[in-house]
Amino acid sequence: MMNEDNKDFTLFKHFADKGNVYLMSGLDKSNPDYSDLVSIACHFAKQGKDVKILSPTHYKDPAYHRVFGPLIGTMYFRKCPDLLINGVFYEYESYERPFKAKKVSHMIKRGADQSERIIIDNNKGASDRYILNMIVKRISDKSFRKDIQELYVYEKGSVRRLYKKKKR
């Protein structure tokens, strides 16, 4: 399953008869989100998915075109989402301490700037109802021009989908 773009990645972890986690070259392991990203990636890999943890890359770099090529020509061109799960980009958003409930809305906004699929850090435990309310407010806001396809919540080492846009 190795193809040309995998020269930018090294295998980090293989789950027997399941998925793999790859790290992009140049990934900053001292990044505060690194351990969360690895935990999230392992969660999806255990479900049989191939997950690539991505590093920020300048859009003029040839590696950007190899890895983030599908974003060219979209509103997400020049953006660098954090994860590539089975060929689909996801953005992980955490918050700066201390946690305040209004930061959930900010995480959704920042995540939607990077990808239409977002994973937010909810280790402080905002309620599902509150998070869903924030999504509805964002979507119904006329000045918010981003599309949110899916939103996952990362809590205490586990990941669960909280929102998926209904197909019309």
Predicted feature descriptions by range:
Residues 1-68, 74-77, 95-168:
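Metal-dependent nuclease catalytic core centered on acidic motifs
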Residues 83-94:
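Conserved catalytic cores of phosphodiester-cleaving nucleases, focusing on short active-site segments
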